[in-house]
Amino acid sequence: MNFKKIVTSLALLSLTMTGCGITGQSKTNKPSLKVTEQEFSKNKSYAKKDFDYKVDPETFQLSLTTNGKTEIVAQPQQPRKIADYQETASEISWSCPDEHVEITLKKEKDHLAVKILNQAKKDNTFSWPKIDAENYTLPIAEGKSIPNNQPEWLKYFLGNNEIDLLEAFSMSFFSINQSNFATTFVLDNTFNSQMIATTEPHLSFETSHTFVGFDPNKTLNYRIYLTDNDPVAIAKTYQKDRVALDKFKTLEQKAQENPEINKMNGALQIYFWNNRLLTSDDVKWQALAAEIDEPIFKWIGELLAKYGEDGDEEYQSILPAIKAGEAYKYEQNVFLNSLNYVLLYPEFYNSDIFTKPDEVASKLIEKGVDKLTEQERYTLNQHLMAGTLGTDVTKPLEQWGQKASTDVLTDMKKSGINKAWIGLPNWENGLMNPKMVAEANDKGYLVGPYDSYQSIQEDASIDWNTASFPNPTLYEDATITNKKGDKIPGFLGKGRKLNSTLIFPDVKERVTGILANNIPINSWFLDTDAAGEIYNDYDPTHKTTQADDVDARLKRMNYLNSLGMVVGAETGNDFASEGMVYAHGLETPVIMWSDPDMRQNKESEYYVGDYAAVDGGIPSKYNKVVPIKDEYKPIYTDPLYSVPLYKLVYNRSVITSHHWEWDSYKIKGLTGQRRLQEYLYNTPPMVHLDQATWQDRKEDVVQNAKTWTPFQEKALQHEMTNFSYLSEDRLVQRTDFGADLSVVANFSKTDFQLGKETIPPGTALIIEGTKTTLIDTRTVEK
């Protein structure tokens, strides 16, 4: 098949356009319900209804014919023993006694239904279909179009040949592109489904499904659709299927339940780092030198020695330099990290050290230190420390950290960033600095913490508060056991994975504790909950299935939504599409966990960075700009192999962006290309900011926001209704959002002529009716 045939006649259109830009807040009225219903109704026309099929039960080879053209869509497998063959006018069925399954094929109005019914009482794996095509359209991340002979993809699948569909695919389908048509295999879900990739003589796949013995659902359903070789037809057919299954919920429907969701429309995705309440600007270093022998500093060392993950050795080593008036950058960082660290400790209060607490601290002590909420405990510790250090050594407490937090947010709003999601790396960042959270809320921003219920650690340090729970029974009684009887290790091999079905009371306890003092958090981000790390738990005391796991995750999403939170989750795989509003990780997923040059070799130019920042700002893992190897570009970033499958389905349902490890600026030499794709795909830009990075990136972030916010406000009012290639090399691409909003991105190295408009390389043209705006990324790289 020649994909150049897909090139649309849009390239030949002569359009009359003016130079008016998309600037300022959107004043466009939302389209009527009738308009959006019309956009949905077109989906009915994509699947071919006039088709025939032929199946060989022994090999399960399946052929489909339409318009006199036949393709083998499921390749023959090793012959199986069959029994109970029956054929009627509408159905063919048989059983495979050795595999303990019954198979039924039925031709429906617009698809072929294949039902595989498991009869085994124990775990049972059945493989089908085996697919071999010239090209594959797969929902890997946002979407990929993969030729069967592309060298980098072959190398990738050679090293990653076992594919867990629940984790690897963002949606529950896969498509093959053959000479005459595309065939799309749609599943109810991808629970317990895998693919094995073969790379010789070219790329092919075989899918299998494991029926879990204790799972009450014994049926695997495929709905097989025929469409043109067009990603729009494939995606819209899948969208129609999801709507029919009642598994589709628009942002408008979600906002009816929680109006705060409207703040996400047009919002930049900003991870905001303020890990220090007490900053270098807040300390009077020369005055400190004379006070360094005071008991409080000895007490801080004792706390670090007893409770700190790294002990007190480094802290003790810098005290003599501070006393000598030689508090340089290193000494200041160690000192500030130590003081901010102990502010988190429940054990910080010591009546022998803090003999004269101020009024606020005294009232909190009277309540009982062990009865305080987490926010109250932080408030107590701050007042104890500030009162003991005094204003001779530090600025007044109310000024601590504000220059690096509230002042930055104020400047963001003043500079023209009208809509933003502000993500905090942990809820403690908000509870330690509630003024900053209030400032974000007052500015009309969404603000909320990163949270995780993936893992639990036994005796977790305060650094791992997401892996720590007050309930002492969870580690033994609520963790996941695999089929072999082993506990599944937690993140980075620490602790264990939690069973989501067993911890809902603990979720409520954590959330209630965080919100106990009415801190104005209005968003919540859930790590891993839409990333496909879903499990069957074989523990005989609490056997649960992947379906149970997903239901439990949706339950906690719905709980947070009921509290007025705008809920987001990692990646955005669509089993969670009804529960989340936004997702991070779909547009740029985590790139190559397994490459040591990126993950272990700190001398490599590709090393992505460290999790910790010695200066309390953004860890280098998130703000260090690094190149990626050429072999990874076709897999992760090359627009030649990317297709907006997810956006064609969920543009009006889930707002998706990059994984936080790979924000819009992270990849050296690709910031401009990725920005073009952000507009083309309606993907919010993401950036990690602290005080210093805000000053560094301010001009570019603000300038981009002036166009981005009104653009997305309009784009979210419609389906993504079309995606097309405008050039023979497929490097000039167009997306349409309804009838009056389009984006044309030029990823090539030559000018592209669209009617009277010249679109230079490295630019994108936004077309809104007769108005155009040029997005020029040619100077965005630093």
Predicted segments, located by residue:
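Glycine-rich, aromatic-flanked loop segments that form ligand/cofactor-binding clefts
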Residues: L268-Q269, M436-I488, M565-F575
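Bacterial N-terminal signal peptides
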Residues: S9-T18
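Bacterial N-terminal signal peptides that target proteins for export
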Residues: M1-V7
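Carbohydrate-recognition beta-sandwich/jelly-roll modules
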Residues: N29-K419, E439-V447, D451-Y453, V566, ...
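N-terminal Sec signal peptide cleavage junction
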Residues: C20-I22
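Active-site-proximal substrate-binding groove within the catalytic cores of carbohydrate-active enzymes
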Residues: V55-F60, H202-I234, D281-V283, L288, ...
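Aromatic- and acidic-residue-enriched carbohydrate-binding clefts of CAZyme catalytic domains
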Residues: T379-T391, D463-K497, N536-T544
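Active-site-adjacent beta->alpha loops and helix N-cap segments on the catalytic face
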Residues: N429-M436
